[in-house]
Amino acid sequence: MENEFQDGKTEVIEAWYMDDSEEDQRLPHHREPKEFIHVDKLTELGVISWRLNPDNWENCENLKRIREARGYSYVDICDVCPEKLPNYETKIKSFFEEHLHTDEEIRYCLEGSGYFDVRDQNDQWIRIALKKGGMIVLPAGMYHRFTLDTDNYIKAMRLFVGDPVWTPYNRPHDHLPARKEFLAKLLKSEGENQAVEGF
């Protein structure tokens, strides 16, 4: 199922290596020259993504199939913008602190856009631009952070397996089982890729 719904996915999900600038976090932060990353690289890191139809999400069969297959039993919708999110400044700061969760983080962009930053296997930041229609799953145990872009607005569906628990563990929390399991999967994936390349 992870490979379904790929048509036009790069129009709603784009990724690149970030520079080290301390400028406004809402800027793209491209390196010079720009280093874009294919979605397959994100998949290797454990990040799953789809392109869906956000204008009819209530009746979207593909969304229903994903939810059933992955056990996403709870959803809610949140607007992240200064006008609609209570304690906006505090929340945005906490979202941008590097952290992990012991469960997947699943977000489906219904309107607007934003950035998820994730670490690659060499601890380099990759910026993932999520636009309207993009759905992304960050694996449990992956260090990441979130920020709006300069448009300052995203309307996102949050999906959960069971109760809606969003507990961030700010880095470092390498002792957590979710982190150890994530790293083990990453090493296994790297080993398999090297074996194929060496064949």
Curated annotation (Swiss-Prot):
The molecule here is called Acireductone dioxygenase 1
Q: What is this protein's function per UniProt?
A: Catalyzes 2 different reactions between oxygen and the acireductone 1,2-dihydroxy-3-keto-5-methylthiopentene (DHK-MTPene) depending upon the metal bound in the active site. Fe-containing acireductone dioxygenase (Fe-ARD) produces formate and 2-keto-4-methylthiobutyrate (KMTB), the alpha-ketoacid precursor of methionine in the methionine recycle pathway. Ni-containing acireductone dioxygenase (Ni-ARD) produces methylthiopropionate, carbon monoxide and formate, and does not lie on the methionine recycle pathway.
Residues given in the record as Ni(2+) binding sites: 99, 101, 105, 144
Reactions accelerated catalytically: 1,2-dihydroxy-5-(methylsulfanyl)pent-1-en-3-one + O2 = 4-methylsulfanyl-2-oxobutanoate + formate + 2 H(+); 1,2-dihydroxy-5-(methylsulfanyl)pent-1-en-3-one + O2 = 3-(methylsulfanyl)propanoate + CO + formate + 2 H(+)
**Which cellular compartments is it found in?**
Cytoplasm; Nucleus
Going by the record, the broad EC class of this enzyme is: oxidoreductase
User: What EC number(s) has UniProt assigned to this enzyme?
Assistant: 1.13.11.54, 1.13.11.53
Show the PANTHER family listed in the entry: ACIREDUCTONE DIOXYGENASE (PTHR23418:SF0)
- Assigned GO CC terms: cytoplasm; nucleus
Q: Which GO terms describe its molecular function?
A: acireductone dioxygenase (Ni2+-requiring) activity; acireductone dioxygenase [iron(II)-requiring] activity; iron ion binding; nickel cation binding
Quote the record's binding site residues for Fe(2+). Answer: 99, 101, 105, 144
> Pathway listed for it?
Amino-acid biosynthesis; L-methionine biosynthesis via salvage pathway; L-methionine from S-methyl-5-thio-alpha-D-ribose 1-phosphate: step 5/6
Question: Pfam families recorded for this chain?
Answer: ARD (PF03079)
Cofactor details (free text): Binds either 1 Fe or Ni cation per monomer. Iron-binding promotes an acireductone dioxygenase reaction producing 2-keto-4-methylthiobutyrate, while nickel-binding promotes an acireductone dioxygenase reaction producing 3-(methylsulfanyl)propanoate.
Per UniProt, which keywords does this protein have?
A: Amino-acid biosynthesis, Cytoplasm, Dioxygenase, Iron, Metal-binding, Methionine biosynthesis, Nickel, Nucleus, Oxidoreductase
Q: What is its main location?
A: cytoplasm
Inducing stimuli: By low levels of ethylene and submergence.
Q: Which residues form the signal peptide?
A: none
Instruction: Write out the GO biological process terms.
Output: L-methionine salvage from methylthioadenosine
Q: Which family does it belong to?
A: Belongs to the acireductone dioxygenase (ARD) family.
Cofactors needed by this protein, per the record, are: Fe(2+); Ni(2+)
